[in-house]
Amino acid sequence: IAANNHPVRHGPVVGIHNGIITNDEELLVRHDCARVEPRMTVDSEAIFAVAAHSHSDAAALEALEGAMAAAWLDEREPEVVHLARGVGRPLWLGRGADGIFFASTKLALEVVERYCHLSLRKREVREGTLLALTEGRVLRTSRFHPRRYVDPDPLPAIRAPGERETCLSRLATLAAA
């Protein structure tokens, strides 16, 4: 169903997520949150329900189990983009004269540089970090202790056969437009 696609909305929060949250149903019950769409099954909704319930408090993210790199906007703070990295998924920032870019891989930021003719200072965000960005700068940095799940090794950002090539081709097409 369409509600299972990103971006995902929960109340005032809308976001995107790379990874898998394994305790999503438990968290929705704990926070007395009904799914926005009754037939929705996407695990990412739990991240945004927690963010909505806690007003994007870093400590609340410790309740999430699984792999996570996520970005969201909260209508109560519309000028701020929140970026969070738990475990198992990478999150990269690229700072340039035109602002801050984020992606799951350094390679994606390099594609942005190449096709948008930018120079970015790239860095990987540390696990257990919540960033609040506004007007091209980091407004706040908060730390949290993400829960480790069964496999503590980072999952590859690209997993499906041909996914890398497909993603790069789509990025190049978007950049050329």
What is the predicted function of each stretch?
Residues 1-177:
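Conserved short alpha-helical segments that host acidic/polar catalytic motifs at enzyme active sites
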